[in-house]
């Protein structure tokens, strides 16, 4: 009985395999086409960025760190173009009148749409230090005079990003420690209560 039951299972599997593989092929073909269409659509959409924008800040990533920086730059009236992978964030920025490009900054076409060649600053706030390093190297080759500031989480990322051409690399933990040391050097005016 058991062997007969297993035989039925194997027969069904053999019969279903061609169907499943055909469906998988169709899905993968649609996925590849969708990715190509997405890039083409993104390029078409980004044609709205004024061609004459130059000497601007190019901010890669508008998450927790990027949004804080972006708001300060906007408040200071510094011309800004944001590159962001989140469609929702890009739509929100555009609704506010902020120039935003949907895509990955590692893609040269996306950087062209954001006018890397004449940007004054490139600010990378993305959390992946190695991806940031590759973006830095590519940007430095295309715009040797650009000021590049990047974010890192680890010492090896700082080295990697710096070697690829960043002018400055900020590591969160170091900045927290530096600020705490500064606070120790200038204690508060009031009485300090300890446990």
Describe the predicted segments one by one.
Residues 1-6, 10:
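Single conserved hydrophobic/aromatic residue that forms the stacking wall/gate
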Residues 11-23:
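Hydrophobic transmembrane alpha-helical segments of multi-pass transport and channel proteins
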Residues 48-193:
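Structured cytosolic domains appended to multi-pass membrane proteins
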Residues 28-59, 194-195:
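Long, charged amphipathic helices and adjacent flexible linkers at domain junctions
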Residues 3, 21-24, 136, 177:
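Hydrophobic face of alpha-helices
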């Amino acid at each position: 009985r058991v062997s007969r039951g297993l035989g039925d299972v194997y027969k069904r599997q053999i019969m279903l395999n061609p169907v499943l593989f055909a469906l998988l092929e169709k899905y993968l073909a649609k996925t590849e086409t969708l990715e190509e269409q997405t890039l083409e659509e993104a390029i078409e959409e980004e044609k709205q960025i004024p061609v004459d924008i130059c000497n601007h800040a190019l901010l890669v990533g508008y998450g927790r760190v990027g949004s804080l920086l972006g708001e300060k730059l906007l408040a200071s009236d510094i011309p800004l173009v944001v590159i962001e992978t989140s469609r929702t964030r890009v739509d929100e920025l555009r609704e506010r009148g902020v120039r935003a490009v949907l895509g990955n900054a590692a893609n040269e076409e996306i950087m062209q749409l954001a006018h890397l060649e004449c940007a004054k600053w490139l600010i990378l706030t993305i959390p992946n230090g190695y991806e940031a390093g590759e973006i830095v190297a590519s940007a430095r080759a295309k715009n040797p005079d650009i000021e590049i500031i990047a974010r890192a989480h680890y010492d090896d990322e700082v080295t990697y990003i710096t070697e690829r051409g960043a002018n400055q690399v900020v590591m969160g933990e170091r900045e927290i420690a530096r600020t705490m040391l500064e606070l120790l050097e200038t204690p508060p005016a009031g009485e300090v209560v300890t446990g």
